[in-house]
Each structure stands twice: as C-alpha cells, then as structure tokens.
C-alpha cells in the first residue's frame, strides 16, 4: 500500500476513510515525515464542518420531504401513500440513518483522533451500523427501478397483485440485504492500540474486500437500475406515442359528434381528455424523477469508488490529500435526493405550504385530485 494513502480504505466507506486518512496525516506530521504535496490536506476543523453540514442538510431535506408527502396526501384525502412515495420514504429513512449513525459517529471519532474511547464491542457495532445505510440506499434505488419496471413494463402482472405489497416487498428485501452485506464489518474491525481499526490478514484480503464493497454498493446496483430504466424508457416512449395518436383520433371523431350536441357533453369530453393527459404526465414525471435520482447516485459515488479500487490495486497512483477531497462527493448523495424530488414535484411542495392559495383552474384541479386520489394509482 502507498506511502500516503495506505489507510484511506481500511474501512471502505467515505465516512470512515476521512478519519483513517486524517489519523495517518496526524501521525505523519508528528514523525516529521516530509514529502511533496500538490495541495494542502483539509484541516480538522474543515472536516468537522463538512460532517456537520452533511448531517444538518440531510436531516432538514429528508424531514421536509416526509412532511410534504404526508401533507399532500392529507390535502388530497388519500388514505395511503403511492408505491413511489413509499419507496421514497424508505430512501428518506436510509438517508437520515446515514446522517445519524454513519456521519455522526465519524465526527466523534475524528474529534478524538488518534484514540477510540469505547470497548471493542462498541468498535465492532459502530463499524457494522455505519455501512448499513450505504448498502440500503443503493439497494433501495434498485427497488425503485424494479418497481417502476413492474408497473410500466408489466402492467397486467402488476394489476394481479396489490400495488402496495410490491414496494413493501422490494424495500424489505433491500433492508435485509443491507444488513447481511454489513456483517463482515463485525469481523474485520476491532479495537487495537487504542484505535478502532481493521484486522486484514493479507493485502489480498484488503484488495478483495474493497473491490467487492464498491461493486456491491455502487457498480452492480447502478448497472441493474440502468438496465431496468432502459426498458422503462422504451415502454414509456411507446406508450406516450400511442396515447397521443389515440387521443388525436378520438378528438376528431368526437368533434364531429359533439358539434350537434350540448356543451355539457363537450365539458365531459374535455375532462376525460385532461384526465388521460394527466395520467401520461404523471407517468413520465415519475420516470424522470426516479431516473434522475439513480443517475445522481451513480455520478456522486463514482469518484470515490473509482479512487478506492485504484488504491487497492495500485496504491502509489493517487495522492492521499486528493483522495480526501474526493471522499466529500460520496457524502453529498444523502443530501441530494429530497431536493431532486422537490424539483420534479414543485406543485406538491407549494401545496404543502399552509399560507399558499391554489391558483389552478377548477377543472384541472378536479382532474388532478381524481387521478392522485385513485386507490389504484401506481404513480
């Protein structure tokens, strides 16, 4: 392992690598080891401030998203959350846990560097709990992708079972898998010489675990979600094109019939058309939202995961200070999801504001409420 980068991935997670790298740099300075550095390493204050900002922004954004979802359902008199909302609530839970049990303990450990004040059991439990939200977040993205694939690409099979059982099953599998994949942390870490550190027996074990971790938490979920969304986008494009053509033909036929009839039937036809348009819009909007969340997860985790693998197989290739700054990108993922949801659901965010009055036309509002309060709505 490299001269400056040997401990950044002792815990192959961005939150723990910050502590490990900073510990190494502190010991390096104490021993008066000098080497050329292209940039100054972040100070302890900067790292602590970064962790604190991640915690505050994550808690605020995800708590606000939970409030907006339930507030809108109350306004629309919907008794249950939709499948997408249910999975987004699970994502909020994973992000909140990341802030509390992943980043939070890291702040405490970083503040007490180079010592870990706690028994060996607490060391193992901390390392075990820290990675559960990371696995859960990635697996829940696959669950969202699979749910959209089932709802859009296989609608007949989806109708045979309850639309609420499917996301509950997918989210349950995601959390269970996250716990199972986190169990190696219980065996890899222990308290030694006052610090909670790894106990790899060989360099090959370290390399295999780092590569496996990054594959399971980033590469494989991204690949699976990408393939599912490729199928979803094709299905949505075909469905939208067919619906548009069908509506145009119906308009022509109905126009000929309605020219001799009263305006009441014209209003009924207009309402039915708007309902169809609203369903298509909701379908496309849902796909855009979930696809953007998956893409953001891939982009934000890519720098750290690629850096991790490079260090595992070629330790001298990357400067430790540069790798520390790269680490910051992965932590931003827990902050982004709520704001991406708000971007695609600005109307729901405005509706949740108690002081804002609705300015939607009456017929459009009625159509929207009918679509969104339908117990069979999958969006």
UniProtKB/Swiss-Prot annotation:
Residues 19-48, 117-124, 190-207, 311-320 are extracellular. Pfam families: 7tm_1 (PF00001). It is found in: Cell membrane. GO terms for molecular function: G protein-coupled receptor activity. Detected in the left ASE gustatory neuron, the chemosensory neuron pairs ASH and ADF, and the PQR tail neuron. In males, detected in hook and tail sensory neurons involved in vulval sensing and hermaphrodite contact, and in spicule protractor muscles. Coiled coil: none annotated. The keyword Membrane applies. InterPro entries: GPCR_Rhodpsn, GPCR_Rhodpsn_7TM, Neuropeptide-GPCR. Disruption phenotype: Viable and fertile. Gustatory associative learning in response to salt cues is disrupted. Males have reduced reproductive success, due to a range of aberrant mating behaviors. Double knockouts with ntr-2 partially rescue the reproductive phenotypes. Disulfide bonds join 123-196. The chain crosses the membrane at residues 49-69, 96-116, 125-145, 169-189, 208-228, 290-310, 321-343. Glycans are attached at residues 32, 199, 319. GO terms for cellular component: membrane; plasma membrane. Keywords: Behavior, Cell membrane, Disulfide bond, G-protein coupled receptor, Glycoprotein, Membrane, Receptor, Transducer, Transmembrane, Transmembrane helix. Receptor for nematocin. The activity of this receptor is mediated by G proteins which activate a phosphatidylinositol-calcium second messenger system. The activity of this receptor may be modulated by ntr-2, leading to reduced intracellular cAMP production. Plays a role in gustatory associative learning. Also plays a role in male mating behavior. Belongs to the G-protein coupled receptor 1 family. Vasopressin/oxytocin receptor subfamily. This is Nematocin receptor 1. The gene is ntr-1.
């Amino acid at each position: 392992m490299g001269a400056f980068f040997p401990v950044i991935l002792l815990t192959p997670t961005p939150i723990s690598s910050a502590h490990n790298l900073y510990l190494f740099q502190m010991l390096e300075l104490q021993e008066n080891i000098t080497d050329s550095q292209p940039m100054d390493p972040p100070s302890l204050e900067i790292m602590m401030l970064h962790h604190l900002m991640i915690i505050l922004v994550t808690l605020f954004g995800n708590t606000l998203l939970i409030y907006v979802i339930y507030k809108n359902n109350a306004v629309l008199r919907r008794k249950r959350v939709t499948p997408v909302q249910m999975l987004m609530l699970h994502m909020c839970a994973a992000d909140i846990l990341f802030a509390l049990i992943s980043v939070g303990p890291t702040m405490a450990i970083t503040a007490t560097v180079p010592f870990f004040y706690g028994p060996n059991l607490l060391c193992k439990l901390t390392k075990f709990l820290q990675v559960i939200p990371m696995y859960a977040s990635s697996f829940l993205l696959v669950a969202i992708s699979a749910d959209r694939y089932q709802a859009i690409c296989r609608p007949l099979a989806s109708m045979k079972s309850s639309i609420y059982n499917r996301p509950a099953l997918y989210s349950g599998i995601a959390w269970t898998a996250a716990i199972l994949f986190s169990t190696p942390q219980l065996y890899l870490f222990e308290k030694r010489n006052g610090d909670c550190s790894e106990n790899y027996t060989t360099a090959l074990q370290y390399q295999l675990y780092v590569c496996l971790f990054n594959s399971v938490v980033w590469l494989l979920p991204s690949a699976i979600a990408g393939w599912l969304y490729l199928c979803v986008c094709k299905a949505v494009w075909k469905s939208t094109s067919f619906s548009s053509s069908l509506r145009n033909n119906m308009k022509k036929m109905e126009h000929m019939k309605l020219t001799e009839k009263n305006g009441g039937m014209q209003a009924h036809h207009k309402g039915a058309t708007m309902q169809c348009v609203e369903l298509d819009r909701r379908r496309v909007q849902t796909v855009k939202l979930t696809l953007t969340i998956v893409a953001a997860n891939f982009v934000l985790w890519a720098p750290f995961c690629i850096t991790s693998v490079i260090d595992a197989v070629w330790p001298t290739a990357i400067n430790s200070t540069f790798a520390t700054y790269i680490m910051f990108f992965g932590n931003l993922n827990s902050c982004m999801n709520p704001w991406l949801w708000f971007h695609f659901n600005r109307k729901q965010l405005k509706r949740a504001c108690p002081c804002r009055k609705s300015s939607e036309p009456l017929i459009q509002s009625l159509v929207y409420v009918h679509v969104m309060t339908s117990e069979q709505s999958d969006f």
